[in-house]
Amino acid sequence: MAKMTVLQYPDERLRKVAQKIEKVDDNIRSVIDDMFETMYEEQGVGLAATQVDVHRRLFVSDCSEDQNEPLVFINPEITEAEGHFKNDEGCLSFPGVYAKVERAERITVTALDKNGERFSRSAEGLLAICIQHEIDHLDGKLFVDYLSPLKRERIRKKLEKEQRLAEKQAAEAQ
């Protein structure tokens, strides 16, 4: 397994729409393993393939406190959604940024698992938020798209400033 690089906003590759996976094979399973390693190391609860520059319809998730409930969703589709609530969301592609986003309270998702077997799962709470957030990534949509243009611009400027500062510090350290 190998840790992957998580793309950071405003990288335009985060806007690419992911392509359907036609066959679940060893290459896809290897990507899944690497994505789990990356997600756990970055202390996330979900990671879409597009966030690691793999533009396929796949995401991994583990919303458990002990990181012992790994879930794989290949070609996911939300088939039911009900209720609405706002909750703070963060994202590995937006380090240190959190914002209130409105999502469906309860959902049902259909997808393929790591073995290519179709399954359906209902979710609420953090898992429902995570599934909706990661599917948005696969569609080229980011959680900041739910915010006002002013808030989006402030976040973009903040992250660009932090990136410049990190690059300057790295150059000075050499």
UniProtKB/Swiss-Prot annotation:
The keyword Ribosomal protein does not apply. The active site is at E134. InterPro entries: Peptide_deformylase, Peptide_deformylase_sf. Keywords: Hydrolase, Iron, Metal-binding, Protein biosynthesis. Signal peptide: none annotated. It holds the Pfam family Pep_deformylase. Gene3D superfamilies: Peptide deformylase (3.90.45.10). The keyword Hydrolase applies. Binds 1 Fe(2+) ion. Removes the formyl group from the N-terminal Met of newly synthesized proteins. Requires at least a dipeptide for an efficient rate of reaction. N-terminal L-methionine is a prerequisite for activity but the enzyme has broad specificity at other positions. PANTHER family: PEPTIDE DEFORMYLASE. This is Peptide deformylase. It comes from Idiomarina loihiensis (strain ATCC BAA-735 / DSM 15497 / L2-TR). The lineage of its organism: Bacteria, Pseudomonadati, Pseudomonadota, Gammaproteobacteria, Alteromonadales.
